[in-house]
Amino acid sequence: DVSGPVIDLQPLQETEMDELLHKLRHVQAYGEAKNYLIDDMGLWQFMLQCRTIYGAQYYLNPRLAIKTLLDLLAILQQNPNAKVAELISEIS
């Protein structure tokens, strides 16, 4: 629907993307750091993998990284014995 007002959003900067993904992890853990399914190092590896796979789209369209992170967290929640590094390496 383009009949209404349109907001022209600038691509997210690297620090903004980092903050967004950290906050999504925090929300998924119900605001409790002890419930994080992926630690800071794992989240950093996730971001590097996304940058490699998505390239410029990683910043232009954050939906890709958001959906991928939420999918990864759902898999980790359903499979507590899953290895984070292995799952991240399988992201494509």
Predicted regions span which residues?
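C-terminal alpha-helical "lid" subdomain
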Residues: 3-92
